[in-house]
UniProtKB/Swiss-Prot annotation:
GO biological process: copper ion transport
InterPro entries per the UniProt record, alphabetical: Cu-bd, Heavy-metal-associated_CS, HMA_Cu_ion-bd, HMA_dom, HMA_dom_sf
Gene: copP
A GO molecular function held by the record: copper ion binding
Function text: Part of a cation-transporting system which is associated with copper export out of the H.pylori cells.
Domain HMA: residue ranges: 1-66
Residues where Cu cation binds: C12, C15
Annotated protein name in UniProt: COP-associated protein
Length: 66
């Protein structure tokens, strides 16, 4: 499954690295693409990962969904 999540507050490579770290820790995530210009994160995943878990990881990293 592939989802595109709007994320507020990402401004630099450190933000990209932090999102990739938190989301990448979820089992089942196979791809993470962070687009600073569009303020979005694209994630490809399969079970046991879920859209809800990915959104929670982004929130845990300190960013807002939007």
């Amino acid at each position: 499954m592939k989802i595109d999540i709007p994320v507020k507050g990402m401004t630099c490579q450190h933000c990209v690295d932090k999102i990739e770290k938190f989301v990448g820790e979820l089992e089942g995530v196979s791809y993470i693409g962070v687009d600073l210009d569009k303020q979005s994160v694209q994630v490809e995943f399969s079970a046991p990962a879920s859209a809800e878990a990915i959104e929670e990881a982004i929130l845990d990293a300190g960013y807002e969904l939007g």
